């Protein structure tokens, strides 16, 4: 019996010694990491900030994925991560607040990501900048358009997600998913000299595809009365459509 107890005791001592030897090795392969998040509502094309509600930092979820190794972790909030230890290697931190499936005015979704490297026994500070993930759209008309279509006009914007918005008198940007949109419109011409009511004209559908995140799209409708009345549609000040109103659009009246 003494031999049995002695054998077991020696085995336990060896196991404890082995575990103690492994602990420093594991620690040597890890580094500490802190992650912070900042938010900007600056858009890509103008470098100006747009007016929208920015989420608080604790509203951002955090995902960490390994790049040089198999690793994945999710946190409901950036604050939940605090300071943690990760094994040596390269990682990517992604933050998100909002939902791109929720479109509308002041419905901004913010996303951001940053890659970082963990080095043994070193501390790494990671800063992730979250930017607007939506596309921002606004429909405008010129005074010349209003004057020519004095009988009134209606504009409807449709998104790829199936949402529809009345943008007849739009003053703020509409936050939509970065996919594609369609703008449909009807306009009533001014009464003629005999007093007859003006004709209602269906304007050409304006479709914009491959929208980009963090980018503004201003679609402007204008009427040029130099010579024949001409409908002009611009996208961010670039002409994308031009139609003779009497010859090309009256057929849709």
Where are the model-predicted features located?
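Sec-dependent bacterial lipoprotein signal peptides
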Residues: 1-16
């Amino acid at each position: 019996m003494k031999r049995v107890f002695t054998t077991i005791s020696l085995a336990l001592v060896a196991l404890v010694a082995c575990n103690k030897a492994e602990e420093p090795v594991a620690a040597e392969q890890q580094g500490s990491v802190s992650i912070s998040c900042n938010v900007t509502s600056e858009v890509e094309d103008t470098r100006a900030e747009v007016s929208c509600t920015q989420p608080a930092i604790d509203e951002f979820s955090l995902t960490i994925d390994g790049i040089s190794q198999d690793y994945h972790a999710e946190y409901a909030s950036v604050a939940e991560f605090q300071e943690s230890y990760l094994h040596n290697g390269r990682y990517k931190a992604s933050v998100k607040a909002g939902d791109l499936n929720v479109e509308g005015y002041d419905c901004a979704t913010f996303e951001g990501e940053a890659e970082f490297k963990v080095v043994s026994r070193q501390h790494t500070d990671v800063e992730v900048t979250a930017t607007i993930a939506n596309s921002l759209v606004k429909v405008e008309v010129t005074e010349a358009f209003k004057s020519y279509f004095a009988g009134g006009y209606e504009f409807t914007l449709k998104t790829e997600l199936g949402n529809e918005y009345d943008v007849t008198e739009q003053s703020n940007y509409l936050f939509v998913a970065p996919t594609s949109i369609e703008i449909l419109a009807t306009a009533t011409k001014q009464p003629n000299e005999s007093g007859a009511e003006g004709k209602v004209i269906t304007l050409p559908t304006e479709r914009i595809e491959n929208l980009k995140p963090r980018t503004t799209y201003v679609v402007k409708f204008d009427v040029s009365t130099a010579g024949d009345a001409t409908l002009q549609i611009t996208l961010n000040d670039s002409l994308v459509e031009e139609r003779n109103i009497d010859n090309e659009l009256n057929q849709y009246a």
